[in-house]
Amino acid sequence: DQGAGVTYLEPSASQIGHKESIKDTARVLGRMFDGIEYRGFGQDVVEELAKYAGVPVFNGLTNEFHPTQMLADALTMREHSDKPLNQIAFAYVGDARYNMANSLLVLAAKLGMDVRIGAPKSLWPSENIIETVQAVAKETGGRILLTENVKEAVKGVDFIHTDVWVSMGEPKEAWQERIDLLKGYRVTPELMVAAENPQVKFMHCLPAFHNRETKVGEWIYETFGLNGVEVT
């Protein structure tokens, strides 16, 4: 939309980290482009690209963080609330070990927001992430709560976030385990009411398994009897 020239290198068209080192790839791409966005799995890959590219490198998504999504989410919450960012409260419910929960914690800590994580303790973010964001929140006035009680997590919030329960690349066998652990953390009309805020809004980074209208959604319904998984 802004007139930039964009080149997309799909996985099959790149030898990064396979036949060519990340360091060498970074140096070559940095000579050809003014910026690089990396979307993949390893956080170490995007950090090594940033170290050697010599141009700005943007993290489009890794297993650990999703900062570009946070730019969109912060804008969306600001657009759909009459409060300044540091007065907005939001919850994340579900599997909190990966990029969305981690990044929402970082977002809230840096902007002084009120964030609650509602998840089984076995699916909480790592201790390192928690300690890091708590230290930042002390400086910014951010409020961070981690709880296994989903109703405590959503009480009074302006937004409820979630994400898929099984991430890219995980086997089908993971579904049974996650459903058993997380069935009490689905975003349902009842959970929205539990926020006790008639203006509460739902957010999801997408794609969402919210019905049977996909092959995976239909398989989940036939296998587990769920019409919608993390959200109904």
UniProtKB/Swiss-Prot annotation:
- Enzyme nomenclature, EC number: 2.1.3.3
Q: Which residues bind carbamoyl phosphate?
A: Q15, R39, H66, P67, T68, Q69, H204, C205, L206, P207, T232
Question: Which SUPFAM superfamilies does the record associate with it?
Answer: Aspartate/ornithine carbamoyltransferase
Gene Ontology CC: cytoplasm
Q: Which family does it belong to?
A: Belongs to the aspartate/ornithine carbamoyltransferase superfamily. OTCase family.
UniProt site (Important for structural integrity): E79
Task: List the Gene3D superfamilies.
Answer: Aspartate/ornithine carbamoyltransferase
Sorted UniProt keywords = Amino-acid biosynthesis, Arginine biosynthesis, Cytoplasm, Transferase
Cross-referenced Pfam families: OTCace, OTCace_N
Q: Name the reaction it catalyses.
A: carbamoyl phosphate + L-ornithine = L-citrulline + phosphate + H(+)
Q: Which NCBIfam families match?
A: orni_carb_tr (TIGR00658)
Name of the protein in its database record:
Ornithine carbamoyltransferase
**Presence of the UniProt keyword Ribosomal protein in the record:** no
Q: Name one GO molecular function term.
A: amino acid binding
Its BP terms in the Gene Ontology are: arginine biosynthetic process via ornithine; citrulline biosynthetic process; L-arginine biosynthetic process
Query: Which positions in this protein are listed as binding L-ornithine?
Result: N99, D163, S167, M168
**Compartmental location:** Cytoplasm
Q: In which pathway does it act?
A: Amino-acid biosynthesis; L-arginine biosynthesis; L-arginine from L-ornithine and carbamoyl phosphate: step 1/3
The primary gene name is argF
Task: Name the job this protein performs.
Answer: Reversibly catalyzes the transfer of the carbamoyl group from carbamoyl phosphate (CP) to the N(epsilon) atom of ornithine (ORN) to produce L-citrulline.
Specify the domain of life of the species encoding this protein. Answer: Bacteria
